[in-house]
Amino acid sequence: MPNWRDQYLSGIKDAELNNPVNMELVQTCSQMADRISALEAEKNGLETLVTTNGKTTARPTEPSTNDPAVAQLKQDLAEALRSKGVAEKRLRSSEEELLQLRSKHKTNTRSIRDLTADKNSLTTRLKDREYELREKRKFIEQVQDEMIALNLQMSMAEKERDKVKKENKELVDRWMKRMAQEAEAMNLANEPIFKKGR
């Protein structure tokens, strides 16, 4: 059955594979776990050695507290445990920060998706508006061209009307002059008859 260090190390590796947080932190934890394992193995070996060598003494099960190796081992173990606590604290802090960043990432992703949809909608509306404006410009240009053509036609019609009016007036004037001449000629021709009748 794996001990707590192996489980802890395996859990860190699994977490790192599934959710990479901070490789440096994971490596530090792994190194500390290895160091703790080595120190505890060394401690067990020293305790066994002290127990074996001290069977003839009055305290066979307790290693000598004055042994510098044991003291150093305890100091190293305490330092390793302290470093482990610091690393675990940093790991928890990193995991919390990761959760916050993931939550923020989801929010940002949703915002980006919404903004992209708004942008696409506005782009479509803008294209429709540009198309509408182009068509209106074409229509205005057509109307202006038609107005110019109508003005030209009207100007030509007015000139034609003035010409016809002038020709009619000249024709009427000639006809009136002719009628007057014919009337005068008739009067002159009938004047001897009028004189005889008197």
Curated annotation (Swiss-Prot):
It is a peripheral membrane protein. Keywords: Autophagy, Coiled coil, Membrane, Protein transport, Transport. One of its GO terms (cellular component) is phagophore assembly site membrane. Disruption phenotype: Does not significantly decrease the growth rate under nutrient-rich conditions. Strongly reduces conidiation. Causes only mild infection in point-inoculated spikelets of flowering wheat heads and impairs the spreading to nearby spikelets. Also reduces strongly the production of deoxynivalenol (DON), an important virulence determinant. Residues 24-177 form a coiled coil. One of its GO terms (biological process) is protein transport. It comes from the Eukaryota. Signal peptide: none annotated. This is Autophagy-related protein 16. The lineage of its organism: Eukaryota, Fungi, Dikarya, Ascomycota, Pezizomycotina.
